[in-house]
Amino acid sequence: LAWGRVERRLPVVRRFEVPVARPVPEVTILQISDLHLFPGQEFLVEFLRRVAATERFDVVASTGDNFGGPDGAELVREAYAPFLDRPGFFVLGSNDYYSPVRKNWGRYLTRSKGPRPRVVPDLPWTAMTRMMADAGWVDLSNRTGDLEVPGVGALSLLGTDDAHIHRDRYVDPAPSWEREG
């Protein structure tokens, strides 16, 4: 548990190569996920500014859980500001809709019904998605979309909303997807 307190303040960039079956143009995707921003997390905004300035990537993928509470909206705007001039796409996580609820860690070790699910979002997810969409990013929450990436070409994408809160709906690939026999 002690290391967890330290490690959460030491963000890192990890690199993975994903093999593909057919020759396709090389594309580098920067994934931003699980920021859980709230006042006091400014170090994450600074880390992301450094990433934007020093890393080479073609497209940004935001995969949700950006808010650590209702008071994190300004930090979310600041965190994404250096990336919004790049091509991007996004899906949402539960902590884009609902603020986190403290949980007993022991609950993960036993069968538990857990807290009652909430149905009314209390986080400013619409403002965040509007910011990203206004920058030309593609919303893939239960949708498909095409994204033109300079130097790479068009990416045909498919996404779902958060499965943990039962908002996911799988959609058929867009006609732009090549289908093989």
Describe each PLM feature range.
Residues L1-P23:
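N-terminal membrane-anchoring alpha-helices
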Residues V12-R15, E42, W137-L140, H166-R169:
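Short gly/ser/thr-rich secondary-structure transition/capping motifs
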Residues E17-L30, W137-V138, G145-L157, R179:
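Beta-strand-turn-beta hairpins that frame and shape the catalytic cleft
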Residues R22-R49:
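Short extracytoplasmic
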